[in-house]
């Protein structure tokens, strides 16, 4: 893909010149450009998680995560089109899991639900959020993912409580 080639058109030589370090310093810290990208992805993931609001609605948590992701939209586009795609997807899933898990565990009904059942709810929401992100990436980030997620969150507000009530989990 052209995104992948854009990432790899940059050579170590270009990177060390732009950063003002020598090649030995680069290779001391990174095996190659993909390992540098992995480190960047890990740092971006940590920053997204770190900047999430503690006490908030699911919509607020999702919005905060997506706004943080949007700050690096161009870089993410190139990484997603590169050989680091699988690694990036795993980090995205980590973000989705964290957003979902912290939200569900903060709900008053979560303590009344069996751990096994709670994990089903978390898994469902996490995978839904991840799927929405992958769809956005596969559409070349061509629509406003923040607004898209706000609409979805409003459409399904209260649905987890209803599921828990329907199956007499609470």
Where do the language-model regions lie?
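Regular secondary-structure segments
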Residues: 45, 49, 70, 129-141
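An amphipathic alpha-helix adjacent to DNA-recognition modules
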Residues: 9-12, 17-20, 27-53, 63-66, ...
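Helical hydrophobic small-molecule/effector-binding pocket
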Residues: 57-105
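A short secondary-structure junction motif
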Residues: 40-47, 72, 76, 98-107, ...
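Secondary-structure edge/capping motif, primarily at the C-terminal ends of alpha-helices
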Residues: 52, 76-80, 107, 136-140, ...
């Amino acid at each position: 893909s052209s995104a992948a080639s854009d990432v790899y058109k940059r050579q170590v030589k270009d990177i060390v010149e732009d950063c003002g370090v020598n090649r030995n310093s680069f290779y001391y810290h990174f095996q190659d450009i993909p390992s540098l990208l992995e480190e960047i992805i890990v740092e971006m993931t940590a920053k997204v998680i770190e900047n999430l609001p503690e006490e908030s609605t699911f919509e607020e948590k999702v919005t905060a995560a997506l706004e943080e992701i949007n700050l690096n939209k161009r870089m993410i586009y190139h990484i997603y089109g590169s050989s680091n795609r699988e690694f990036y997807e795993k980090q995205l899933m980590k973000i989705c899991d964290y957003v979902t898990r912290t939200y569900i565990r903060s709900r008053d009904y979560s303590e009344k639900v069996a751990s096994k059942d709670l994990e089903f709810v978390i898994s469902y929401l996490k995978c839904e959020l991840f799927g929405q992100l992958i769809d956005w990436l596969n559409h070349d980030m061509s629509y406003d993912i923040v607004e898209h997620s706000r609409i979805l969150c409003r459409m399904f507000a209260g649905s987890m409580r209803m599921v828990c009530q329907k199956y007499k989990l609470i």
